[in-house]
Amino acid sequence: TFCLCLFTACDGDDNLLCYGTHTEIEGDVTTFGAIGDGKTDCSKAINSAIASLPSEGGVVVIPEGDFVLDAPIVINKHNVTIKGLNPGMRSNIDVNGINDLLGPGGGSKLVARNAEAAIKVETGMKGVKIMNLMVSGGTEAKNIGIHFTGTSDNGILSNIIGINLHTGIKIEQAK
């Protein structure tokens, strides 16, 4: 089992998305048919949201919910930001013991059910940002969370939590 926690503070540059607000003109994946119910494959809908971005890139918002992926989210444009509202960790108070005091709950979550990677950044992409998400391998723990496939430049990962993954982040030939 793999757990990766990268934390950053929220500030005006992120439009306070980790607190649940966004005011930029952004593409919300639910407008493309993604359903965060933990059952429905959302791969095509999220990839359609990315495809709809202009050639210079843009922001794709993953709202709260469990968005299942049977194929990877493929980033094949420069300056694409995948932005969740928050990574969804909560504390659990167990009056009978101190086990499991922190666990997943709520937030923006990608579940790589049958995808080899939840997010795949294609070779040569520049300015990719992925933030405020939980990435899960589902029940199998055989997946990669975020895969930079080759010479990518200026990629930023911020406020990402990975759970139940074989490999959290795989970076190949980065500059």
Task: State the predicted function of each range.
Residues 79-85, 126-137, 153-166, 175:
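Right-handed parallel beta-helix
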Residues 72-76, 89-102, 117-124, 142-151, ...:
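Glycine-rich beta-solenoid repeat tracts in large extracellular/virion proteins
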Residues 6-9:
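C-terminal motif of bacterial Sec signal peptides marking the signal peptidase cleavage site
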